[in-house]
């Protein structure tokens, strides 16, 4: 039965192509470009940037309660679906230097993997793209865009972040990701509740 269905679909595709309809050229071009995944940083390289001089990086997995998910969502204006958040804590002589979260957010069609580095007070110190999978919008990795996040925190109105022509969806993805990271940090580390 599966073979008959495959033959039927192939026949429809061939017939549609012979009429000059049904198969847009941009689809195949888009698919070819998607295979060009850009890995900018490994996790190890990202931690070296996030925590220069650290003698240790600890991983802290935080399981979220319903109340924490709601609080994070209220701060970043998003529906939080995940049940766990993982923070990485860079330490020197046992003292936290800062925190980082590695997360993913969908650009146009594919996830952008990024790291948000936070100071102990919850303000953004750095944002780095680790892996970019979209054919367009890669300009979000440039310092001229990323530096806009420096100093922002969970109370920031992220609508002040300037967009990039031709990279609107990637910009939105990064804004969502950074605002979610700062909100999670505020709720989990600064709220005074365990």
Identify the meaning behind each predicted range.
Residues 1-12:
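Bacterial N-terminal signal peptides that target proteins for export
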Residues 11-21:
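Bacterial N-terminal signal peptides
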Residues 26-164, 168-172, 176-194:
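Flexible, solvent-exposed loop/hinge segments and secondary-structure transition points
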